[in-house]
Amino acid sequence: KTLVILVHPDIEKSVINKRWIEELQKYPDQYDIHDLYKAYPDEKLNIEREQMLIEAYDKIVFQFPFYWFSTPPLLKKWLDDVLVYCWAYGSKSGYKFAEKKVALAISVGIDEEEYSKEGIYNYTLKELTTPFELTFKYIKADYKPLYAYYGI
């Protein structure tokens, strides 16, 4: 099974992310959906619960809208709080993400051409998401190419 960690602060108003989740829910034998904003409306993460959840899966997808060339705030908090020393990296007992397949599924509200060297922002989405790739490589996860839905 694949764990899909949904990080959308207002999924009910979403178009793309909401549709993705509706489609994934048709296959409960293949996907488990963990909605961070629903699980933690106060944004106070249960770190132990999150770590146990990660340990239970070999395939993890982070699904979120691209906000201000980054992530929704709760995903940044999740990365900072969950990926800690001696669990995610830095010791022989750590590296709990090691060899887990990890991918990003991102909705982007503008056209793909805008995210190019020649586009208005001068950077590709792959370049802008390099910190994710580096983070997951650092903790020895098997980082897969991102999937993006451009436009609305």
Regions found by a protein language model. Give the residues of each.
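Glycine-rich phosphate/pyrophosphate-binding loop and the adjoining helix
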Residues: 22-25, 131-152
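Helix-loop-strand module that forms the ligand-binding subsite of alpha/beta enzymes
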Residues: 48-133
